[in-house]
Amino acid sequence: MRVINLGRQDYLNIWDKMKTFTNTRDKNTKDELWIVEHNPVFTQGVSSKPEHILSNTDIPIVQTDRGGQVTYHGPGQVIIYCLFDLKRLGMGVKRIIEIIENSIIDLLRTYTIKAHLKSGAPGVYIDNAKIAALGLRIKQSRIYHGLSLNIDMDLSPFIQINPCGYQNLKVTQLCDLTDSRDTLNIIAKKLSQILINYVSRNRH
């Protein structure tokens, strides 16, 4: 599996590249993880409703093809896009979602942070505050999109939305929960390796 760090990128540019990669890959194309940090943007999933954006905003709003509802991406947040051939891996969408969520939980455990899942609410939580979101798109057994993990960012844009469709949902970030000085790139590298290890152990 290839891991590519693309640095700071506009969302639309990366979304277009994900679709192109997925549409043109064949049975021999290696799976890839793309590490990205986005410029400020609200993205709406296929289940999102207009009323989940609560106020007028100068932040761009993009209607995407991923699952889920509305969320915010911005500087200080780790994004990892998972471009996988699930048929080749021998797993379904439900299993890959579990792997992504468990990878985030395992990463946070290395910072002595106890994270958990919520029934019916995809993502990863610390107490009642969301620290990570995920949304995927599947096309002919191939997935794209992925996860976002709040590290050290301005959380105020989340006030302008119902994150993931939930009213008054609190959000949190790693820097408020640990004294670690690990950089965004170090954290992204750690999370990528945990994710790769999970996928390797679970493929059939």
UniProtKB/Swiss-Prot annotation:
GO BP annotations listed: protein modification process
UniProtKB keywords: Acyltransferase, Cytoplasm, Transferase
Protein name: Octanoyltransferase
A Pfam family matched in the record: LplA-B_cat
InterPro entries, sorted: aa-tRNA-synth_II/BPL/LPL, BPL_LPL_catalytic, Octanoyltransferase, Octanoyltransferase_CS
Site, Lowers pKa of active site Cys: residue positions: 130
Coiled coil (UniProt feature): none
Catalytic activity: octanoyl-[ACP] + L-lysyl-[protein] = N(6)-octanoyl-L-lysyl-[protein] + holo-[ACP] + H(+)
Pathway participation: Protein modification; protein lipoylation via endogenous pathway; protein N(6)-(lipoyl)lysine from octanoyl-[acyl-carrier-protein]: step 1/2
Binding site for substrate: 66-73, 133-135, 146-148
Additional remark text: In the reaction, the free carboxyl group of octanoic acid is attached via an amide linkage to the epsilon-amino group of a specific lysine residue of lipoyl domains of lipoate-dependent enzymes.
Keyword Acyltransferase: yes
EC identifiers of the protein: 2.3.1.181
Subcellular location: Cytoplasm
Family the UniProt entry places it in: Belongs to the LipB family.
Active site, per annotation: 164
Residue ranges constituting the BPL/LPL catalytic domain according to the UniProt record: 27-204
Gene it is expressed from: lipB
GO CC terms, sorted: cytoplasm
Function: Catalyzes the transfer of endogenously produced octanoic acid from octanoyl-acyl-carrier-protein onto the lipoyl domains of lipoate-dependent enzymes. Lipoyl-ACP can also act as a substrate although octanoyl-ACP is likely to be the physiological substrate.
Single GO MF annotation: lipoyl(octanoyl) transferase activity
